Amino acid sequence: FQVCHSLGGGTGSGMGTLLISKIREEYPDRMMLTFSVFPSPKVSDTVVEPYNATLSVHQLVENADVCMVLDNEALYDICFRTLKLTTPSFGDLNHLISATMSGVTCSLRFPGQLNSDLRKLAVILIPFPRLHFFMVGFAPLTSRGSQQYRSLSVPELTQQMWDSKNMMCAADPRHGRYLTASAMFREKMSTKDLDEQMINVQNKNSSYFVEWIPNNVKSTVCDIPPTGLKMASTFIGNSTSIQEMFRRVSEQFTAMFRRKAFLHWYTGEGMDEMEFTEAESNMNDLVSEYQQYQDATADEEEYYEDEEEEEAQGM
């Protein structure tokens, strides 16, 4: 199942997560993929965005298998900076999102590809079940009117794809480390070139990858490029820097919740303050988990394992 919803407004966050939990009850063994639009740091539509987002993340951590994080502000930035659009409309933002969605799901829709289903993708990208919030990127970035005419080389595509300015959520991957990542190229190309490129990227930026997950960048090839482009690539990264986003929402949440601002809207509909406290602590746990794995080193991992073994023997 794929669900597209926003976490700022009432319908996307409330109805969206309710739908997800009902589907989860009904079809517990099916994969649940969400494309979630998080509230932006500067552009705010409603006052209670932090509440809605925190309550939604609380649900998404439990009920979604894979969550692609999108962000209106990051999309606006891409439109301004990269596409040089002066007044981007929602149509332009949707164009970027649809390109990414098409890239993420291309291995499901076209026959004979590696990573041919969501489950396989999830296995590759999720080292710990709670940490399933991914940043997505797309290259080459084009506006709706001008599909690019020059074709890019594989190294250029790769470079554009890993560029932090291309990420569709407001977190900078350079502030954290990648646990895992996946790159999907859409063109007839040799996998050997591709793997070389990926190894290159990893060697150059080795400090941005955790060393305790070897071979953590997977690449796949799909022969059929998207309409109007000769080649394209989609990037999905599980980076610890996404905690910036959760931390920001959490701070806004705490600032409002401490004063119990606007709470009556929720309690009037039959919600309990306890649910808010729970959602807040779940979000904070998520942030600290990301931080823990960002700081973890290979030696520490071995140390933990030794401790666990000793405990097991002690029992």
From Swiss-Prot:
Keywords: Cytoplasm, Cytoskeleton, GTP-binding, Microtubule, Nucleotide-binding
Entry's localization field: Cytoplasm, Cytoskeleton
Keyword Hydrolase: no
Residue numbers binding GTP: S6, G10, T11, G12, N72, N94
GO molecular function, one term: GTP binding
Cited InterPro entries: Beta_tubulin, Tub_FtsZ_C, Tubulin, Tubulin/FtsZ-like_C, Tubulin/FtsZ_2-layer-sand-dom, Tubulin/FtsZ_GTPase_sf, Tubulin_C, Tubulin_CS
Predominant subcellular localization, coarse grouping: cytoplasm
BP GO terms, sorted: microtubule-based process
Record-level GO cellular component terms: cytoplasm; microtubule
Region (Disordered) residue spans: 295-315
Ranges of Acidic residues composition bias in the record: 297-315
Superkingdom, taxonomy of origin: Eukaryota
Protein family membership: Belongs to the tubulin family.
Subunit structure of this chain's protein: Dimer of alpha and beta chains. A typical microtubule is a hollow water-filled tube with an outer diameter of 25 nm and an inner diameter of 15 nM. Alpha-beta heterodimers associate head-to-tail to form protofilaments running lengthwise along the microtubule wall with the beta-tubulin subunit facing the microtubule plus end conferring a structural polarity. Microtubules usually have 13 protofilaments but different protofilament numbers can be found in some organisms and specialized cells.
Identification of the protein by name: Tubulin beta-1 chain
Organism name: Daucus carota
